[in-house]
Amino acid sequence: MKAFVASGLLLLIFGMWRCSGIEPVSMECDYFTFRVIAKRALFYPDDLIGPDELLLGASCPVTSIRPDELEFYYDIHSCGTFIQHAFDGTIVNTWLTYMPRNISIYAELQLQCVIPRISQDELDNKQSSDECVGESESIDVGNLDFHPPPQCWFLVLKRYCIICGHFHFPNNWLIPYHGWKDESFQRLWPSLFHR
């Protein structure tokens, strides 16, 4: 009965969060680092999440705490991130793990950050003939204007159910989560997923 009440409470919290219109989590990435910023009022406006309740991946703690936000700033290859290379860009997959203090269940928020690939045509169009550097001129590498392109982020909520031992999506809690679309992504707990 307690598990049923707790799962209903999480469903209510996730429903309120999705309908609030607030951007609760944002993710920025480039080819070397990524940053995730989560609102401390992630699920309910009056209930702030503590830094010990939210982890990046399975075990990476918060790197910066502000009154209204928790920030994670890590190397692109840490915290269990999975990198996919596509023809039009690079996709960085990671997740936030929310483990509340007083409840024995936890939730995972999957995140994706897309780094679009810049084509050679786009690079050629940025440099005009009067910007070319002659042989006698030197280039100050510190002043090169190279910024990572704008990123996109996607948020997929899922819940781990202690009763059945599977992950579920919030739009239909009865359908279990069957893992990432790319089966080469190996998690720390592969036995928890349906195969």
From Swiss-Prot:
Keywords: Glycoprotein, Secreted, Signal. The keyword Secreted applies. It comes from the Eukaryota. InterPro entries: PLAC1_fam. Its main location: secreted. GO terms for cellular component: extracellular region. Glycans are attached at residue 102. Residues 1-21 form the signal peptide. It is found in: Secreted. The keyword Glycoprotein applies. Oocyte-specific. Belongs to the PLAC1 family. This is Oocyte-secreted protein 3.
